[in-house]
């Protein structure tokens, strides 16, 4: 048996990070992918992505995480950005209520351009700035519950909950995929298009709710 056979099936999941400009999307990604933080990071134009791997049930799971990298300033995020996404982090800045108020628009756009089974997490970023908080934990939690989302507060600056948030979404994607029936021709075609290798898992995952309390 080859090493590849012993390692088992490989998965590739596309995850998108969405939200208003300057909420910290790029810093969340670089903190998770490279454990780096740049306080002077500037919005760039285009789409960037990082790939991270983790093991779930003995299988290698790769998450290809896409960042809008400034496109949202021009409302130019299109269906191409969402195509094939099986997970999404919707980010707002806890110090700017307008970014929280715009979460609904981002969710509408996500729901328009993606499958209803996308694993979604609402992220209240910059929880290190407690002294100038404008959106309470309770408000974030309430919105997440009403929309059926996971919820967590994070800080790209000090790493609070960053790894936990990404890995929770990745695990939820794996659970969602494992529950899907593979005997549908249309579903098999979808897997081929999205480049996601899947197997049926006997253990069904249970969705949990989590938030950061300070």
Swiss-Prot record:
A motif (Effector region) lies at residues 41-49. GO terms for biological process: inter-Golgi cisterna vesicle-mediated transport; response to heat. Its main location: Golgi. Expressed in roots and actively dividing cells. GTP binds at residues 19-26, 67-71, 125-128, 155-156. It is a lipid-anchor. GO terms for cellular component: Golgi membrane; Golgi stack; Golgi-associated vesicle; plasma membrane; trans-Golgi network. SMART domains: RAB, RAN, RAS, RHO. It comes from the Eukaryota. Induction: By abscisic acid (ABA), phosphate (Pi) deprivation, cold, sucrose, mannose, and water stress. The keyword Hydrolase does not apply. One of its GO terms (molecular function) is GTP binding. SUPFAM superfamilies: P-loop containing nucleoside triphosphate hydrolases. The keyword Nucleotide-binding applies. Pfam families: Ras. InterPro entries: P-loop_NTPase, Rab_GTPases_membrane_traffic, Small_GTP-bd, Small_GTPase. A lipid is attached at residues 211-212 (S-geranylgeranyl cysteine). Changing residue 71 to L: Loss of GTPase activity. It is found in: Golgi apparatus membrane; Golgi apparatus, trans-Golgi network membrane; Cell membrane. Keywords: Cell membrane, Golgi apparatus, GTP-binding, Lipoprotein, Membrane, Nucleotide-binding, Prenylation. PANTHER family: DRAB11-RELATED. Interacts (via C-terminus) with GDI1. Interacts with PUX8/SAY1. Belongs to the small GTPase superfamily. Rab family. Intracellular vesicle trafficking and protein transport. Binds GTP and GDP and possesses intrinsic GTPase activity. This is Ras-related protein RABA5c. It comes from Arabidopsis thaliana (Mouse-ear cress).
